[in-house]
């Protein structure tokens, strides 16, 4: 069946040439016909495509290349055909470039395609087919993915269902790891055209694998195989899924699928690499190498080539062909993507084999970056960095190994590696790590602990000072090494030697030098070249003071190793200890001349210290001193350049600065060094020296004392001398003397100490002698110390150390002591005289004190006797008064009539008003009734009525208020010894107007006749206390504090006396009155009271007469008024009571005055009654 034909019009005629597709002539013949007939371009393109379909690619290329030049463009829309011609040819070149293996040819094809696409851009830039072709070309180049994405996006905006654009977007999304997006594009393309080729299903399968949807991936790969049984990609995908199941049947199926794919396409690199991987685990390394090499040469994809190289490298690695393995590992890392780190792991192992730890670390760091918690990588890196000299890397190693031990706590190797790292910085944790490793070995591995670990644990205990534990582990290590020596005698004998050396060092620490020396010599008998033993024997001899023996041992070490730096350093230190600066300097210079030790830090520091020491020697050559300063400074700087953290070099620079006079800068340097570490004693001493130079003596003293406490278990005479110097400069000579004496106990033969002691004694004695206030004992002691200082200076001026101080200075000081001693007798005499005067003065003072003391004792005794006498007298008076009061109360009780008792009982709470009708004794007045006088006074002040009516009204009002809180009238105290005038008895009181401050008082009438005066005593003067102080008086006044509101000052004692009498006769009053509150109480009087009362009643009866009725009515009305007034005045009464307390001093009146006051008050009461 004919596939068709094409007609070629003949020029200038209506005839055509028909070419059958099944019988196409040669390309050149067709091209000549087309050129001759000036055929239009679209016919050229159609013929070219037909040639391409018939796989006649050469004719296809010739035809399209000729059409670009000779095609007829004289027709409508020729631009689109022109663009199609260029795009078609460019697409062919792109396809060829994808298949080309040769890089140069591939590059040439890509260049031609780029040129054709650029020409097509100039014709029609935004044609869909043109854009699709150009986007596919950008995908092939790889680095223009974003540009291709933009072109696919542009096409999809114009035609959303364009399948090539959808597939291109899916490819781009997959490469950008947007697997869901890629799957969506594939699905859309499949929905748009369900008859898509198998490649679409293959792409979907890859997306499903990346999304971990393995079942759907399996279905997609299966569907692709259904559509195209020769789809190699689908076969490989299914094979990988089967192999990852890790089951025997699945692995077998996977290998069969790979074999089928290999049969279909033997050059497919993916198939070849997977087969190589399979045969590697089958240990068929020859097939691995053949397949991987074949795969490497059949692909230009670098990821595929990296996989092929890796397969080749590990096959050579397992065959121990490390050179070939290194070559292919390295080549694989050049091709590998960032995520493919297996070649770096193998390459790192090859670098370790070659001893290149730096490159090995870099390789494993790349692996760890991709897989941060990979156990093997962290362990290897930890081991590599553990052996590094860089502290930062050691810290990284410690971090990695800690993570390893956390992930796998039973990894013994990791614990041992971690312990070895911690040995330098954290001994305690290192011991803990070794302990864990030991426990794992014994409990889980069921193995003996290696002698190496036992030795290391012992060394750590030795460093911690646990010498007993260290000895136990060293001995255990020796026993274990002897047991293991049966298997590897040479190795374990070497371990035994090391452990024996450590044990000898331990015996040194235990001060068992004999045992230590024996072990060192035993080692030297078996191993004469063990240099460290010679050095330790020399150091022991040096510490004993045997410098010559020490030098011999060090020279023995030099015979074994002529350039041993430690031996030369120890010999140099011997010279420096003897202050042989020149020979010592030469030894350290020799070390620095050797190429291997030309930057030896210890030797350079020693040289700097030598130059610094020369600055301490007295010299007048300033140029030489400056030269030495500069040399020392240059050496210290060189050390810091080699080791920026060397604290000793920084300390040396500070010392040089101090010598140059830059004290402040030197102090800053020392302070920084001390901040970095507080374990260098020289820094503390240098800071203290700086403080002395700055005259901060207190700070210097504190620094010296702290240095002594921190660094020197025993007294260090040098530091004690520094401390004494600081104390001397700050004037604390006594403390300075004590420090120097302490140093003399340590070094009694030190002439410098002797000189300083003598100087301090001289200064102290001088101060004491010049002080005129010094006592005799101090002066005598000063003279004694001055004589001692004189002897010291005389001795030192003859046999002193010329190298340490000037002997002439000692002689000068001796002469000065002699001069002071010549003046000592004057000072002694002056002090003795002063001492005698002071003794006399003290004796006189003591005598005066004794007299004064005796006088005080006598006065105190007299006072005590007087107080006893007064107390006795008061007690007698009180007893008399109590007896008289008791008699009086008994007499008054007999005089009362039953009617009066009844009236008193009935008026207890309320009224209590009396009239003459009630009986003859209703008007009877006793001392208690003066409580009724206070309201009487109020009445007169308020209403201005007569005293008689006011008195009755006041009496009724007072009893109407009830209770014992009756207002009392204060009376003026009569003059001492006065009996009262007759006018007071006859004359009635005149009412007065009340003044703001001064009130007129009615005349007082005596109730007691003169014959009774002196017989009634007030109880106010009787006190239970031993003295009559104000406090006791105040207590007596408080008992009647609330009684008198506006009374005068003389009322206080009367009220107190009455209150006290009431308290003495409670039982009688309770029996005689009903409620006891309103009944009048008996007045304390003598036996003659009854006559006076009778006389008073008779006179009242005669005078009152007919006025009784009117008076009685007035009393009734006045009583009610007074009740209300008394109630309204209660606050005033309270204030009056406060004022009344100020008058309590009246209680001091003598008994006679109290008797007169009582009689006057009685007369006053009678007078008021008579007026009624």
From Swiss-Prot:
TPR repeat windows: 41-75, 129-162, 163-196, 198-231, 235-268, 306-339, 341-374, 412-444, 451-484, 497-530, 531-564, 566-598, 613-646, 648-680, 681-714, 717-750
Subcellular location: Nucleus speckle
The protein's name in its UniProt record: RNA polymerase-associated protein CTR9 homolog
Polar residues bias (residue ranges): 1068-1093, 1105-1134, 1149-1159
Cited SUPFAM superfamilies: HCP-like, TPR-like
Complex and partners: Component of the PAF1 complex, which at least consists of cdc73, paf1, leo1, ctr9 and rtf1. The PAF1 complex interacts with PHF5A.
Amino acid composition bias (Basic residues), ranges on this chain: 965-975, 991-1001
Pfam annotation, one family: TPR_10
Coiled-coil blocks: none
Listed GO biological process terms: endodermal cell fate commitment; negative regulation of myeloid cell differentiation; negative regulation of transcription by RNA polymerase II; stem cell population maintenance; transcription elongation by RNA polymerase II
Chain residue ranges for the region called Disordered: 889-1172
Biased composition, class Gly residues, residue ranges: 944-954
Top-level taxon: Eukaryota
Basic and acidic residues composition bias: residue spans: 1032-1042, 1160-1172
